[in-house]
């Protein structure tokens, strides 16, 4: 069974230990109040949409190529939500262009304990990502917002890069959109610093998703 290691925490049972680790996550974000505003907006959007749709709240993380940041955000967000017992959230990712799930992003997840397996027989390169619940792997592949696999109405759009935020002035069907840009680890591709930079970006995203879903768990 995969053992996903959370940044700063090193714990497996997030739900049972929420009161111990969440204050540390909050403390880590105290020095970036503008970031907390964006993260709190995402928390509010998820809770507001839950009142409208009653059942499943869909969150779509968007970056230009749907290759690195949006894929990392989808995986971390869904894994953390699942671990916290937040069963009404389904996370997705998309891009303004279709490329592929970058190997360096996959490596960053594997370094945290995820198991990633390439799926055979798919028209588009696809991977199954196994987190803390191996019975329900995530199906990850690069796609645009028009892909059939994505919700078309009443979803939350989270842009994870400035380029996607500018490139999608209107996102049809979105209940709300949140700008949550991350620096692109792509600049390190092909250099000795790549593994470290991707790990840093993965950890940053994981920490912020711990904050978002930790707040939601605390409100239930």
Predicted regions and their residues:
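Short polar/charged helix/loop
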Residues: 3-220
